Every structure is written in structure tokens, then in C-alpha cells.
């Protein structure tokens, strides 16, 4: 239910198709395709498993392109961070992050925002002795100095460095 402003204009101008979680059907303007948790969504030349991952919003979903080992996590999981909780609960966010942790470690993670450097600084405050995190920060700083995005990350890197995925 986040980032839906402009749906009507995009549909009108480009003929876009609006896709969203079935539970948000009344909240998302102009929704065309309703998706459910664990559904395999096939369109054109791809298929993705839909994962309902509430926490940031109650209807947040991610798209797991399992054959390619790519997941789009939107605003639930960021590189070295996680999203703010707007509608959900901390328990829901924790469960959603644990759901993502079950994917193969070599899964590439594409998140909704490039907050990696700030997230790295936050992680370092609480996990300063983590050697993997120190290496990751060096890599991030070099990438950002050269104007290169830090995304995608991998689940393996996140499991080693992201304090929110390391929480128990």
C-alpha cells in the first residue's frame, strides 16, 4: 500500500498493469492483478513466487524469482537494514525477515531504496567487531565514491552483516 501514488496516471499514459496483494485490493487504486501469499505468478517470460511479508505495511509482498535466485524485497529488507514499520508490528516484521532468511544464500536481493551506506554505519555501532561487516563497509564506500549502486546484495552477505537478519 506504500508507493501507490500515480497508479491512475501511469495506467492512463502507458497502459500499465497494477499488481498488488489481494488483501490490499480496496486500498490500491486501479489494481488489475490480485496476488496471494505463496502464489506462483506467471507473466510474459517469467515466474515469481509471491511472498506476503507484512511489517512495513500490512499488505507488503515480495517477488521471489526462484529460478534466477533473485528477490525484490521492496521496503521490508534493505541492504544492511530493514524498513520502518508503518502498519505492521515488530513481530510481523521479525517473522517476515525470517521468511526471507529461508531463501538460498546465493539469492540476489534487490531492495526499494539505496540506504546501504547509512545502514552500514548503523550496523557498525552495534556490531563493530564483525570482520565481514568491516569488509562490506569498505566495499560499499568504494562503490559509492564511484557513483556505483551497492544493490544487489546477496542473502549470504546480509546474513553475515545485517543486524536485523542476525537478530534472534
Predicted features, each with a name:
Residues 98-108, 117-168:
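Accessory terminal helices/loops
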Residues 28-127:
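Catalytic core of the metallo-beta-lactamase
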Residues 21, 57, 154:
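Residue-level signal for threonine
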Residues 3, 86-89, 165:
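Short, conserved glycine- and acidic-residue-centered signature motifs
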Residues 1-49, 136-139:
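Active-site HxH/HxHxD metal-binding segment of metal-dependent hydrolases
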Residues 13, 26-27, 84, 144, ...:
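Arginine residue identity/basic-tract feature
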Amino acid at each position: 500500500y506504500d508507493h501507490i501514488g500515480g497508479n491512475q496516471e501511469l495506467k492512463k499514459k502507458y497502459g500499465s498493469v497494477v499488481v498488488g496483494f489481494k488483501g490490499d485490493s480496496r486500498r490500491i487504486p486501479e489494481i488489475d492483478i490480485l496476488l496471494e501469499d505463496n502464489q506462483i505468478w506467471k507473466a510474459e517470460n517469467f515466474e515469481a513466487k509471491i511472498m506476503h511479508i507484512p511489517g512495513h505495511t500490512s499488505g507488503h509482498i515480495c517477488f521471489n524469482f526462484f529460478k534466477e535466485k533473485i528477490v525484490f524485497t521492496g521496503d521490508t529488507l534493505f541492504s544492511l537494514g530493514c524498513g520502518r514499520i508503518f502498519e505492521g508490528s515488530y513481530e510481523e516484521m521479525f517473522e517476515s525477515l525470517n521468511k526471507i532468511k529461508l531463501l538460498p544464500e546465493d539469492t540476489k536481493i534487490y531492495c526499494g531504496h539505496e540506504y546501504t551506506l547509512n545502514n552500514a554505519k548503523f550496523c557498525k555501532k552495534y556490531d563493530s567487531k564483525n570482520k565481514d561487516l568491516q569488509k562490506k563497509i569498505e566495499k560499499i564506500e568504494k562503490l559509492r565514491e564511484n557513483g556505483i549502486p551497492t544493490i544487489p546484495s546477496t542473502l549470504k552477505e546480509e546474513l553475515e552483516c545485517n543486524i536485523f537478519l542476525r537478530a534472534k
